[in-house]
Every structure is written in C-alpha cells, then in structure tokens.
C-alpha cells in the first residue's frame, strides 16, 4: 500500500496556492456553503413553472417526519381522480391507515423471513441483513398495491394522523426492538426442535403483541364508517355502512393489477425488455412480488407522457437528493455548477452511478404535468412531492 508522504502533501499545497481562482472560491464557499455559492442563475431563469400539460392544482400533502413518500404518492394519484370525479374542493385519503397495515404486514414478513433462515448462522449475510433493520417506513409500488388490495383505503377524516404516524422515529425504534426480540424467540424455538404448528402458534402470539403496540401508537383502524362530503356546488352527499375495501372499490375504482413499475437501469447486468425483482423485499406475505420492467429512458418518458395525456397522474421514484434546490423547487443537473465552480470533473454516467452505489431510488413522488416541445418531447416535468411542488428537467437518455 502507498502512504501519503509529506512531499506529496507539500506539492498539493503548492498546486492549490498557485491558483487565484481557488482563493476566490474558497472565500465564497466557506462563507456561503457549496450549494449557495455554486447555484446557477441560468437554471432558475430557464426552468419556469409553466407546463403545456398540467393535470392538477390540488393542494399538496405533507408526509412530515416519516418515510411514507411511496404511500403519499400512490394515495395522491387516487385523490386527484376523486377530486375531479366528485367535484371536491379538497380531499385526502388516510395515509395513516395504509401506514398501520404496512407496519403490521412488515412485521409478519420479517418473522416469516426469520423462520425461513433459521438454519443459517446469525453471521450469515441474509440473517445479518434482516436483523440490521427488521422494518422501516419505505416501500415500492407493488408493496402499496398489495396493501390497497387487501385492506382498502379510508378518508383521512375517518382515520387521521397521530404523533407516531407523522413522526415515526420512536415507533420504528420500539417496533424493531420487539421484532429483534421476537426473532431470537423464534430461532431458539426452532433450534430446540419445535414443530411447525408450535412455531406458527408462537408467531401469532407475538403478532398480537405487535398489533396491540401499533393500535396504541396509531389508533384502532375502522372496520366500518360513514362518508359525507359537499361538492363544489355545495350539494351534500353521504353514505354509511362502508368498509375500507368497499370504499376503495367504489370511490377509487382503478384496476391496479394492470399497472407495473417501469425503470431505467442502464447497467450491463440488466438488459432492457426484461423484468427484475429484489430478494427479501416486500411486505404482504402471499401477495404480488415487487417487480420492475427495465426500459430505455426515452421509452419511460413516452409511457409517462401517454399516461398523463390519458388524464392520469403518474407515481414515480427517483434519487431526489442528487441535484435539487428545495428553496426554488427545482431538480436539474445544471442547478449547481460544480465542475466550473470547483474544478471537479463529474463524468460518471448513470450505469456507473448505479453500479458503484452513488445512486439509487430514494423517494417517490407524482408527475402531474409536463412541458412538451413542438415534436412532443418532454422539456420539463411538474412534480407533486409530499414536501411541496417541484420542477424536474427532462432526463437525458
């Protein structure tokens, strides 16, 4: 191995101090920070929030201090449809309701994975992976569809937010503490030679404890409820005796089994035109698996535009923190000029960023509009985020 010598460091000092530009940038960045010093005027001027296709101006929802973006994004696509269909001024579906059942299902998913890997050492990569984070707030499109199909949805007024749904840190801490303890109980039971029926009975006992914990933290989800609202013309509507499943079927009315996650992952190990899944990723045991269809970026954009032209907003995920100006509400590769501003060359392409862990999907949002040129190609996208509204420039192929 090659150590860093004093002579080499002396040369670095000399090279840096020989540049007048570096001294000016050092003053600007140390006083203002990297983003504030390198923010480009050009990006703000060119990326005005005006779109040739704009599907909604509904109020923006807020996930607060939780990782529920994927739920908010999916429920927002439903609420856009419901607001338009039923002529509502504003409306929200309960994100906390979906959150409750996700925590419940993820707990069972984790315990089933623990049972399935009971013959492996605690130091095995799979068991270590499971125990590192037994469950967390995040998820994928197929996971939220599994929840909707099994548990339905309810209006937010029927099952409102709680402290633990809006700020999930404490809930996750104690739920993971319980699940790791339960993992030890089940592994030791299996190691003692217990039969499947005994293990299943113990798991159900543990799930009752988890259910009780979730109810005390989030509230008891309703089995039946009434739904009343006034439309934009002030006409009153009401319906009683609804269940979460009947409400979902009647008021959402989307065939979610017809939808699939389409991704652009231009890595050598993932040829286009094929679907992929991730081992040990899911929430509802016995439901649809998480799957992604890999396509070129231009095809992905064509599909998103076609869906919006058909009047439907689009659930999507991205690496939201890469190049974003949250104050301006702009996400664009030219929002900061790192290369000229710091004399740094960022040449790694998307495949390289994915392969070398520089990028991954971190956040789900909703495409609600797009600005098209005369040839129908996207210039920029209107994005509804559960932090606020954003503008995305169109990604290159």
What residues fall within each predicted segment?
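Hydrophobic alpha-helical scaffolding
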Residues: 59, 68, 134, 290-294, ...
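Core regions of eukaryotic protease modules
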Residues: 173-308, 320
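Glycine- and acidic
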Residues: 54-64, 130, 283-290, 348-352
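N-terminal regions that are enriched for targeting/export leaders
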Residues: 6-55
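Conserved small/polar residues in nucleotide/adenosyl-binding loops
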Residues: 392-397
